[in-house]
A protein has these predicted regions:
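Short, functional N-terminal and low-complexity linear motifs
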Residues: 17-25, 177-184
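C-terminal catalytic-base region of ester-bond hydrolases, centering on the histidine
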Residues: 136-230
């Protein structure tokens, strides 16, 4: 009999494990065994936090039990680093929520103004330099297009700059969730990618995001039939 996967939920920058609690409870209601992994997003870099996740698993997880991973924002980049650095674990399926796989324009502005606000996370993650996703990993990407949050101030400024150039991007390229551009969430190696009407933080409490995350973990793809009703 195949062992049931454990779902590890990984929060983003300036957050703690508790922020993933509602999503975890919704996955638990669907029968998933979950754990909310907490880490120091400001003080430590992505590789240190990946190593600590590995240490936690060595103490609390049996290597024969498959692992599914769900990461919000920076948490998704930790997933990418972790699955590359620690291939010994049986990784099932991964879902990233609002993760800037191609780097973050918003984080770049903040880094130039006040580096301490993004800390070590910018240097080896939010600048777009995370290791490529291994080919065997099944990854689903959820992006949001509701521009709510403090990060929208930087992105609105950036959009105005882009509109003044001769090579103005399409309206689709200007969509963001208040912190991360939809375009920044796209990664060629992803198995599936969807855009939902949610903001960067709002996606963590959104029922549709939870339902789509659950569906991907179960089927290896998102439920595109449900997207027609949004």
């Amino acid at each position: 009999m195949q062992q049931k996967s454990r779902v590890i939920l990984i929060h983003g920058l300036h957050q703690t494990a508790w922020i993933m609690r509602l999503l975890a409870k919704r996955l638990q209601a669907a029968g998933f065994d979950t754990h909310q992994y907490g880490y120091r997003s400001m003080r430590d870099g992505i590789k240190t936090n990946s190593a600590r996740l590995n240490d936690w698993l060595e103490k609390h997880h049996h290597p024969d039990q498959p692992i599914d991973l769900v990461g919000h924002s920076l948490g998704g980049l930790i997933i990418r680093d972790f699955v590359t650095q620690y291939p010994k674990w049986q990784i099932g399926r991964c879902v990233t929520l609002g993760t800037p796989h191609l780097g973050s324009v918003c984080a770049d502005y903040i880094w130039r103004l006040t580096p301490a606000v993004v800390g070590r996370s910018y240097v080896d993650a939010l600048d777009g330099t995370v290791a490529p996703l291994p080919e065997h990993i099944t990854l689903g990407v959820i992006a949001g297009n509701r521009p709510y949050g403090l990060g929208q101030l930087f992105l609105q400024y950036h959009n105005r700059k882009l509109r003044k150039t001769n090579n103005m991007p399409s309206a689709e390229h200007l969509l963001h969730d208040g912190t991360v551009y939809v375009e920044e969430t796209k990664i060629e190696a992803a198995t599936d990618h969807i855009v939902l009407p949610v903001s960067h933080t709002g996606m963590l409490v959104d029922k549709t995001v939870a339902a789509q995350t659950k569906y991907f973990l179960q089927h290896g793809q998102f439920d595109h039939s449900e997207l027609k009703h949004l």
